[in-house]
C-alpha cells in the first residue's frame, strides 16, 4: 500500500493527542529521541491528510459540506500548532540531559523539521482560506485554470508522499533526496509558467483580474508548501546519514 492510499482521515485524528511522547522521557536520551522521531512522522502524516482535504474543498459545491471540510482543516491547523509546541518542548527537555554531540545535533535538526512541518499545515490552511475567499466573491475559474491547479496539486501531493516515505525509511543515503529535488524543480518551473500564462490570459480577457489574483494566490501558496516539504526532507536526510 502506498503512503497516499494509507493517509485517510480517521475519527481519532480529529482529536488532539500525542501518541509516542505522552509518558515523558525514557531511560536514555537515544530512546527518547527515537520516540520523538515517531511523533514527528505522525505529525507529517497529518499535514498530508490536511492537503487531501484542501483538494476536496477546491471542487466542493455543496455549501454545508464545504463548511464542514473547511472547519476540519481549521481544526487540523490548531492541532498542528499544539503538536509543534509539545514536540519542541519534549526535545528541549531531552536536550537538557547528558547528551553526546551527535545527539545534540540530531535534536537541532529534528526541531527544524518540526517547524517546517507546522509551516506545511499553515500553508494548507492558507490554501483553504484562498478557496473560501474565491467562493465568497463568486469567482469562478476557467476549465484551464482548474486543470493547471489540478496538476500543481498533484505535484505537491507527490512531494508530500515522498516526504512521508523518507520519514518512514530506516536507512537513507544522500541520493534519496534527489526525487524530492526533482519534484521541487517541477513545482517551481510550473509556478513560473502559470505566472506568465496568467498575465497573458488576463490581457486577453479570458477572465477577470480578480479571478487571476485568487488563482495565483493558490499557485504561489502551493509552491511555498513545496518548499517547506523539501526543507523537511533535507533535515531528515541530514539527520540520518
Task: Describe these PLM feature segments.
Residues 4-241:
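Cytosolic, long alpha-helical scaffolding segments
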